[in-house]
Amino acid sequence: IIVLGLVLSSYTNAGTSNEAKNKKYIYKSLDDLKTIIKKENPSDLKELKFIRKSENKEFFATAGLGHGVKDNRKKRSAYEYDAFVFHAIYNSGFKITFLVDIDFAKNLEKAEKYAFKYAKLMGQIPSFLREGTTKFDGEYKDANLGVGTGTERGVKIIVIGKGNYRWWADFNQARFILYPSAKYQEDLILMHESAHLSIHGKITTNINWYPAVLADGKYITKYARTNRGEDVADTISFWVAVRCIENFSEKKKNKILKAIPNRLKFLDNYVKENKLSTSPMVCDLKN
């Protein structure tokens, strides 16, 4: 799920559910894929450092929507909070700030447990989903990766919040908020939200993406029909499953390959042509 600014929303999500609502979908939800990343799989996480505990309601956030809310335009509740602050450093030097809401974790021990859990898992997904495709080095550089939105910076901040709400990503802050109490397949939803912040804009504005969508003629999940951004975000986990996971179910693999061959081919080419890192995963990209 993603929340966008007005201009950004009209640009990257030009295709809405109106064009897809009657299209066939293969899986009811992303969770139907089941967990594909195991605890013992390698992680690019180098270290997790506790920085401080904030005071006087230093941070501001907007809560996720309830699970029964179907309209993403519904008003979200905003609130101030304090947090245990951690920095997760990855092998490339990339840093993600974790803010663990003290209303969720009352003490440092619990906060560190959850920060480490998600920092490690973020280190297990392909690097380009975590670290983005646009580099900012004093000034914006497009790096020949397509038009995009100028926001594909990767994941800078992850908020770990209290409550049973839907996770969601915020382009403007390069962050997403997650809720451990929500019963998601966490590896899949982490990749989904990370995709919003790393490749969503580049892919939805790439001239070769929508022809691939049309050629497939269907969507991988029911939710992927919401708009083009959610299509990208849900599709990425299925691409990872068939290209990067050893011993993945042959039955599921064949079903996915048959359902969205053109999207998968696009993603293979996109990763190869732009020399995107999939570390720590080794992915079998097709010609």
Language-model-detected regions and their locations in the chain:
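Classical Sec-dependent N-terminal signal peptides that target proteins to the secretory pathway
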Residues: 1-17
